[in-house]
Amino acid sequence: MKITVVCVGKIKEKYLTMAIEEYSKRLSRYCKLEIIELADEKTPDNASPAEELQIKKKEGERILKNIKDNAYVIALAIEGKMLSSEELADKMQLLGVNGESHLAFVIGGSLGLDSEVLDRADFKLSFSKMTFPHQVMRTILLEQVYRGFRIMSGEPYHK
C-alpha cells in the first residue's frame, strides 16, 4: 500500500522533525510512504474572512495538484468522523481489500482546508473536536497510521 501525506506548512521544530523521521522509518516496513510538504500562505494577523478564504483557496489549489487521480483521499477535518485506532486500522484494511492501494491523507494549513479539497475527499477524518497545530497533527497522523498497520498485522501495540 502507498500512503501519501499532503500537508501545508513546514516543520520548524526539531523534536517534531525527529518524531516524523522515526515514524517514517517504522512505516517503511508496512508501506511506501511519501510526505509532500507544501508552502503555506502568510496570513495577516487581522485577515478578513474574504482574505482567509483566498488563502485557503490558494493552499487548496496546491494540495489538489499533488493528489493523484487514483488516490483514496482522507482529509483531516474537525467536522469529519472520529474513529478509534482499531476503526482506522479496519478502514485502511477494508480499503486495501477493496483495491484501494493508494491512500492520500491531507492536512491543511492553519486556516484549515478549502471546500474544493473537502469535496475531493473520499472520507473526512477527525482526530478530535479540538484544534491542533498542523505540524503536530502530522506526527499524530503518522503514529496512528503506524499503529493501524501494527493492528492489521496482529502485532502488539500500546492500548
From Swiss-Prot:
Binding site for S-adenosyl-L-methionine: L76, G108, F127, S128, K129, M130, T131, F132
A GO term for molecular function: rRNA (pseudouridine-N3-)-methyltransferase activity
Subcellular location: Cytoplasm
Domain of life of the organism encoding this protein: Bacteria
Record EC number: 2.1.1.177
Any one GO cellular component localisation term in the record: cytoplasm
Enzyme class: transferase
Entry keyword set: Cytoplasm, Methyltransferase, rRNA processing, S-adenosyl-L-methionine, Transferase
Coiled-coil spans in chain: none
Reaction it catalyzes: pseudouridine(1915) in 23S rRNA + S-adenosyl-L-methionine = N(3)-methylpseudouridine(1915) in 23S rRNA + S-adenosyl-L-homocysteine + H(+)
Subunit structure: Homodimer.
PANTHER family membership: METHYLTRANSFERASE (PTHR33603), RIBOSOMAL RNA LARGE SUBUNIT METHYLTRANSFERASE H (PTHR33603:SF1)
HAMAP family linked to this entry: 23SrRNA_methyltr_H
Role according to the record: Specifically methylates the pseudouridine at position 1915 (m3Psi1915) in 23S rRNA.
Family the entry assigns: Belongs to the RNA methyltransferase RlmH family.
Stated name of the protein: Ribosomal RNA large subunit methyltransferase H
Protein source organism: Lachnoclostridium phytofermentans (strain ATCC 700394 / DSM 18823 / ISDg)
Species lineage: Bacteria, Bacillati, Bacillota, Clostridia, Lachnospirales
Gene name, Swiss-Prot/TrEMBL: rlmH
